[in-house]
């Protein structure tokens, strides 16, 4: 403006600077004394600074209550009870977070320190952790194989009480298309033909087999020959009770043991008593 003071006449300066900018009427400017361009510019700036008042701050509508949530897959999980307040959206109207509009779901600019219920947070954390990775319902123990407790139809019929079996003799084979990525196969298939082998030795098992045979029932009865029965009847007719020397002699003659001879004499006396008792009952 100062450079234009020497060449521009006063009437053109009046037309260049509008009367409204000086805050005075047009009549006063036309009737007043003439000023140079430099003086008039200084006065205009001072008067404009006095008359301009600070612009009021733009008022914005009260922030509406928003809800917090997160997207997983094609579903949206809302957390309405969580204490989150919106203090002002700093981002633009089309701001987005992970492909979803920010102004629709949550305000990432500032969050208040409102306490959140512990049950709600723990429940949401567990749910998100479950849907995020889809883990197994339980973790397998390395080095052990699960065996069902229920007995099989083709088994021996006794229940298996061992729930875990050591797999020290097994090595993993990896497969690309399998779920777990590896299966266990025995190193040597001809180690033990019977998986459930008893720790007892062979002699002990043999003795137990003999004991079980005796427990099943009486030993098979061996009938006496006619020669043996004739010799026993002859000695019984002589004496119903046998002595030690006589028992040895009969055992040698009949090729029977002394115990067999003794038992035969006992049974013979019982049989005679029965016969005598029947005869007495028949006699009137």
Curated annotation (Swiss-Prot):
Gene3D superfamilies attached to this UniProt entry: Homeodomain-like
Residues within the DNA-binding region(s): 217-276
Any GO MF annotation of the entry: DNA binding
Main localization (coarse): nucleus
Domain of life: Eukaryota
Transmembrane segments: none
Keyword annotations of the record: Developmental protein, DNA-binding, Homeobox, Nucleus, Transcription, Transcription regulation
CDD domains according to UniProt: homeodomain (cd00086)
InterPro entries, sorted: AP_axis_regulatory_Homeobox (IPR051003), HD (IPR001356), Homeobox_CS (IPR017970), Homeodomain-like_sf (IPR009057), HoxA13_N (IPR022067)
UniProt subcellular location: Nucleus
GO cellular component, one term: nucleus
Pfam families from the UniProt entry: Homeodomain, HoxA13_N
Any one of the GO BP annotations: positive regulation of transcription by RNA polymerase II
Job of this protein: Sequence-specific transcription factor that binds gene promoters and activates their transcription. Part of a developmental regulatory system that provides cells with specific positional identities on the anterior-posterior axis.
Family statement: Belongs to the Abd-B homeobox family.
Protein name in UniProt: Homeobox protein Hox-D13
UniProt organism field: Heterodontus francisci
Gene name linked to the record: HOXD13
